[in-house]
């Protein structure tokens, strides 16, 4: 079904809303854990839900290569395959193709590349991406686009953005031809160039989508550039449609995204960092493998209500990490995912109570950091 987006409240640029799908509701601003291969690494769907997650991100490119469309269709769709009955957003595969580097060739038609799993020559285009995502049963389908690399000259970024716009139209046309009852999001490109972002927004809104993502950020550009692009782009996006900042990011990035009008985020950071022993807490980050934690019998974060913090000490988590025990990665992941969801809950509450900027000040004060400057207000 078509999603319903209710924008309930604004506090400055920060937006408080709700996404309603056939499979459930999602409170925004929202963070989506990443389940690349149909699993949030090391977690059962029940455990992910327990952390407060209401929507997951799946990866079109990787699920197409393994297990493939036929296996997916045998189960029904990705929801049935992985036993997650909440909403799922799938990225189109564009970013993964971008990440392949030398083993891919991008043309107007699409992307030729070698399968990183077995070396086979394969081809992906906008139409194929729409077909795969329909088979996945994605509640939110992303258009096929090219992620503009950083750094890129204005001419390079313009050429890439214009091709992404043509691919956006092809994605829209094929999505409609397939009679997909779900939702299609456009992706704004244009690198760090505001004039190119303007052209991209205009082109995408003329085509018309159910939501709009800001892509091509967090690919190596300075934070100031990311903030500037968001400040410039977000006010131009339709007020009544959800806004999604792709692949971002650190807790600070989520706060800064919300300050500039973003509703949805995804990132591998909480799960990947958990497996590397980098754990997010109220005051910043704890590196659990550091020797100082060997004899620390206190929980990771006294403010955290997750299963890990309620039951285990830093000393135990340090021990598991040093011994490379699988349980260590699992407990760390539970904690980091819950940290991210608690952060989003706090953000939503602050917007509800008209004190979001006060929340921002307190957030940075706990980290002993200055609040980054905020540019023009919408």
Swiss-Prot record:
Gene Ontology molecular-function annotations: metal ion binding; tRNA-guanosine(34) queuine transglycosylase activity
Metabolic or biological pathway: tRNA modification; tRNA-queuosine biosynthesis
Entry superkingdom: Bacteria
GO annotation, biological process: queuosine biosynthetic process; tRNA wobble guanine modification; tRNA-guanine transglycosylation
Known catalytic reactions: 7-aminomethyl-7-carbaguanine + guanosine(34) in tRNA = 7-aminomethyl-7-carbaguanosine(34) in tRNA + guanine
Enzyme class: transferase
Residues annotated as transmembrane: none
InterPro entries found in the cross-reference section: ArchSynthase1/Queuine_TRR (IPR050076), TGT (IPR004803), TGT-like_sf (IPR036511), tRNA_ribo_trans-like (IPR002616)
Entry's cofactor comment: Binds 1 zinc ion per subunit.
GO cellular component terms attached to this protein's record: cytosol
Residues reported to bind substrate: 91-95, 145, 189, 216
Region feature (RNA binding): 247-253, 271-275
EC identifiers of the protein: 2.4.2.29
A Pfam family matched in the record: TGT
Co-factor requirement: Zn(2+)
Active-site annotation: 91, 266
Keywords: Glycosyltransferase, Metal-binding, Queuosine biosynthesis, Transferase, tRNA processing, Zinc
Binding site for Zn(2+): 304, 306, 309, 335
Stated role: Catalyzes the base-exchange of a guanine (G) residue with the queuine precursor 7-aminomethyl-7-deazaguanine (PreQ1) at position 34 (anticodon wobble position) in tRNAs with GU(N) anticodons (tRNA-Asp, -Asn, -His and -Tyr). Catalysis occurs through a double-displacement mechanism. The nucleophile active site attacks the C1' of nucleotide 34 to detach the guanine base from the RNA, forming a covalent enzyme-RNA intermediate. The proton acceptor active site deprotonates the incoming PreQ1, allowing a nucleophilic attack on the C1' of the ribose to form the product.
Similarity comment: Belongs to the queuine tRNA-ribosyltransferase family.
Description of how the protein assembles with itself and partners: Homodimer. Within each dimer, one monomer is responsible for RNA recognition and catalysis, while the other monomer binds to the replacement base PreQ1.
Name assigned to this protein: Queuine tRNA-ribosyltransferase
Originating organism: Vibrio vulnificus (strain YJ016)
